Amino acid sequence: MLLILAQWLQDDFGFFRVFNYITFRAVMATVTALLIGLAAGPWVIRKLSELKMGQAVRTDGPLTHLVKSGTPTMGGVLILIGIFVSCMLWADLSNRFIWIVMIVTFGFGAVGWVDDYRKVVRKDPKGMASREKFFWQTLIGLFAAIYLAFSVSEINNLKVLELFFEWVKSGFALDLPAKTNLLLPFMKEVSYPLGMMGFIILSYLVIVGSSNAVNLTDGLDGLVIMPVILVGAALGAFAYVMGNAIYAKYLLFPYIPGAGELMIFCGAMGGAGLAFLWYNTHPAQVFMGDVGALALGGALGTIAVIVRQEIVLFVMGGIFVAETVSVMMQVVWFKITKKHFGEGRRIFRMAPLHHHFELGGWKETQVVVRFWIITILLVLIGLSSLKLR
């Protein structure tokens, strides 16, 4: 919105030309989202408390968590407010990538909000039924995956729908002008051709998988938000490089017109995340809830797909991956041993992984900070792939 105003004024007032720089608007988006979150935080927390949006705590978990019972949840709304307002102010609203990431973010946020609402207000411990949640996640994820398959290229955005129908009529065999190769990090000009269907399937798995992985990681005060900020910032750097023809050519990346604008979204997400951390740091005044975790995870996955860094996301988000794998291993092993031995056995003391370390004697703050440190190292490894090829 401000970009439109600045472009109208820049001929008369030269200062407004600075708004044409993505880096400037990314910084301002970060600061704006941060200030909005810090200012609105007390009001949001107070309203959540008045509405009795208190988090129920598992009785079979670490005993230290029992004191958290009743802490307001659904604080992810605070993050989404900051992202929305900041992007509306600083992003180029004609950019299709901004809108698809916003749609996925707020779509998953809506799913999370319904899940939280049923858990907290209706006192239903299961929240949204697994099949219902999976249906809506699949609907949003497939929509984004199919759209991106036809738009991550230099085609006119208005042709996306037309090309989609042509692809369907061809029996999913039409060769379309879309960049669907899987880029292999640390390798110079090496990629794996996925084809249109392969791209759609991979994109869907990355978007939905990332959303659920971040949600599983959200279990301790401040645990998930810092990795989200760090990974988001790194993806913003990739977006800036691949959205710039000169930098993309120099670093041997495919040029994706318009991708650089995602740096503004990543900045807004980082600023809103820092504001949330101000109130979520131990002892937390508010929890993120599914409304925030599902939304942020979906955003990371979508951005990674757009900039073709799915494998790098897997590396940088190693904490999210480890948490998810720990749950999968625990469930599968429990079912197998129950079938063969009559009682279920566990690999971990408790899943997700952060609870395993808690029950092993680590304090909550130790788990959180150590997971942050691991994420910093993984993000640095991911960023090194910009040059080490």
Curated annotation (Swiss-Prot):
Main function: Catalyzes the initial step of the lipid cycle reactions in the biosynthesis of the cell wall peptidoglycan: transfers peptidoglycan precursor phospho-MurNAc-pentapeptide from UDP-MurNAc-pentapeptide onto the lipid carrier undecaprenyl phosphate, yielding undecaprenyl-pyrophosphoryl-MurNAc-pentapeptide, known as lipid I.
Keywords assigned by UniProt, alphabetized: Cell cycle, Cell division, Cell inner membrane, Cell membrane, Cell shape, Cell wall biogenesis/degradation, Magnesium, Membrane, Metal-binding, Peptidoglycan synthesis, Transferase, Transmembrane, Transmembrane helix
A GO cellular component annotation in the UniProt record: plasma membrane
Domain of life: Bacteria
Subcellular location(s) of the protein: Cell inner membrane
Name the record gives this protein: Phospho-N-acetylmuramoyl-pentapeptide-transferase
Catalytic function, reaction form: UDP-N-acetyl-alpha-D-muramoyl-L-alanyl-gamma-D-glutamyl-meso-2,6-diaminopimeloyl-D-alanyl-D-alanine + di-trans,octa-cis-undecaprenyl phosphate = di-trans,octa-cis-undecaprenyl diphospho-N-acetyl-alpha-D-muramoyl-L-alanyl-D-glutamyl-meso-2,6-diaminopimeloyl-D-alanyl-D-alanine + UMP
UniProt organism field: Polynucleobacter asymbioticus (strain DSM 18221 / CIP 109841 / QLW-P1DMWA-1) (Polynucleobacter necessarius subsp. asymbioticus)
Alphabetical list of NCBIfam families matching this protein: mraY
Listed cofactors: Mg(2+)
GO MF entries: metal ion binding; phospho-N-acetylmuramoyl-pentapeptide-transferase activity; UDP-N-acetylmuramoyl-L-alanyl-D-glutamyl-meso-2,6-diaminopimelyl-D-alanyl-D-alanine:undecaprenyl-phosphate transferase activity
Coiled coil spans: none
Primary residence: membrane
Chain ranges passing through the membrane: 25-45, 73-93, 97-117, 135-155, 190-210, 222-242, 258-278, 286-306, 311-331, 366-386
Catalytic class of the enzyme: transferase
Pathway annotation from the record: Cell wall biogenesis; peptidoglycan biosynthesis
EC assignment: 2.7.8.13
Family that this chain belongs to: Belongs to the glycosyltransferase 4 family. MraY subfamily.
Keyword Phosphoprotein on entry: no
Membrane topology qualifier: Multi-pass membrane protein
GO biological process: cell division; cell wall organization; peptidoglycan biosynthetic process; regulation of cell shape
PANTHER family the UniProt entry points to: PHOSPHO-N-ACETYLMURAMOYL-PENTAPEPTIDE-TRANSFERASE, PHOSPHO-N-ACETYLMURAMOYL-PENTAPEPTIDE-TRANSFERASE HOMOLOG
